[in-house]
């Protein structure tokens, strides 16, 4: 392998050009992701199903495409949300939806405090409608999964997006990379070598 790399190592200009090409590929992918985030209004427009809680609708490893431009999430809609303080997206179905303030005074106060924190002092912080979710394959609803003192999810504060499409099993690659961090290093190394070996 080193014999094949020798011509590139002896020619710094060509090596630099290949490295810049590799950086261009990575930056293009990053910009594409950001553009998709802006278009869908979602911080994570594509997510992977990590558990079997939504079977048979979705299996572990399915790749989901999200849309977050709708002001409401209706009963029966499948949404992805983040629990406060945790960075793990959960994919579950809406089983109850409430208009603004209909979710109970305790939940309403929490939502107003969260809205104030995120919007800053002196800015308006309207509270959107609330919802209760549940996995299709789960017996109980998600109340136990929510943050302490939280009774319902808030559409604006907690929801990453609503599922609009999916590709089965494709997400297993990312699950494998997450469960085996060394595979990321190997994959990046292989990509780097392939770029270096490309002929101009």
Curated annotation (Swiss-Prot):
Main location: endoplasmic reticulum
Molecular function via GO: serine-type endopeptidase activity
Spans within the Lumenal topological domain: 34-200
Region (Disordered): 101-134
Localization per record: Endoplasmic reticulum membrane
Active site: 53, 92, 142
Positions with biased composition (Basic and acidic residues): 103-119
Membrane spanning residue stretches: 16-33
Single biological process term from Gene Ontology: signal peptide processing
Glycan-linked positions: 41
E.C. number(s) listed in UniProt: 3.4.21.89
UniProt membrane topology term: Single-pass type II membrane protein
UniProt function note: Catalytic component of the signal peptidase complex (SPC) which catalyzes the cleavage of N-terminal signal sequences from nascent proteins as they are translocated into the lumen of the endoplasmic reticulum. Specifically cleaves N-terminal signal peptides that contain a hydrophobic alpha-helix (h-region) shorter than 18-20 amino acids.
NCBIfam families named among the record's database cross-references: sigpep_I_arch
Protein known as: Signal peptidase complex catalytic subunit SEC11
Organism annotation: Arthroderma benhamiae (strain ATCC MYA-4681 / CBS 112371)
